[in-house]
Amino acid sequence: MNKFLIIDGLNLVRRIYAAIPDENDMDSLTDRVSVACTKLLRIHHPTHVAIVWDGDEISWRKQLYPDYKKGRKPMPEPLAAGLSALQEHLKSLPIQSIYAAAEADDVIATLAMKTAKAQGEAVIVSTDKGFSQLNHPRISQWDHFNQQYLNIAELEQKLGVDRNQFLDLMALAGDSGNKIPGIAGIGPKSAAELLRTFRTLATLFSSLSNLGAKQAKKLAEGRDMARLSYKLAQLQTDLPLNINLRDFRVNGPANTQQAE
């Protein structure tokens, strides 16, 4: 069975970079990233591996909602200046790069789902909880920094909803980290309570007459924003990727791919 290790490039690199005392020490960063990647290969024994990077194009989410990810700290200048050299160095490892047109997340999600549907196993290396929406028994998520798989049961308990309600929760309450708005006046706790009662957004919005007037008004006025937020939070899993799985076989020929 194929096992595809899919590394969220900037998620890994930026976390490692943040722990380096000297922000200009790119040699140390390169060494630490190389060690991390080698460790990932040793732990997971994949048949295939890729590291996916964000591209420079404006994402469709930003075009749909200009405030998406607004206010995020930009990449530190030393890292931005040294990233190309780091990516070039990684070619010396048996880890091939894929460059997304815009956001890496949709490419990662598509790779994972295509692998799972082909009866393979996909392991996503990232601390981004957004990947938890990929509800498939052959997709898992590895937190390199805590050296453990994402525990979905713990996340469900923390959020107060089932996994299949994660997107509905973000549609109602938003996601402050990505500046996904949600509905004004509906926080995570009240959103979870609503979903425990009504289970889905569709049922909730068809049952507003069962709610108090104030809450029903918030939901009615925020319905369009909830739909937008759901769309922003939902990962694309069917992108047309111009890649060949053979190119990412461990110990295969070095190659760099551009995702379309």
From Swiss-Prot:
Entry binding sites for K(+): 172-173, 181, 183, 186
Occurrences of domain 5'-3' exonuclease (ranges): 164-259
Cofactor note: Binds 2 Mg(2+) per subunit. Only one magnesium ion has a direct interaction with the protein, the other interactions are indirect. Binds 1 K(+) per subunit. The potassium ion strongly increases the affinity for DNA.
Enzyme Commission numbers on file: 3.1.-.-
Cofactor: Mg(2+); K(+)
Keywords: DNA-binding, Endonuclease, Hydrolase, Magnesium, Metal-binding, Nuclease, Potassium
Start and end residues of each stretch annotated as Interaction with DNA: 185-190
Listed InterPro entries: 5-3_exonucl_a-hlix_arch_N (IPR020046), 5-3_exonuclease (IPR002421), 5-3_exonuclease_C_sf (IPR036279), DNA_polI_H3TH (IPR020045), FEN (IPR038969), HhH2 (IPR008918), PIN-like_dom_sf (IPR029060), Xni (IPR022895)
GO molecular function: 5'-3' exonuclease activity; 5'-flap endonuclease activity; DNA binding; magnesium ion binding; potassium ion binding
Family listed: Belongs to the Xni family.
HAMAP family: Xni
Purpose of the protein: Has flap endonuclease activity. During DNA replication, flap endonucleases cleave the 5'-overhanging flap structure that is generated by displacement synthesis when DNA polymerase encounters the 5'-end of a downstream Okazaki fragment.
Name recorded for this polypeptide: Flap endonuclease Xni
Source species: Shewanella sp. (strain MR-4)
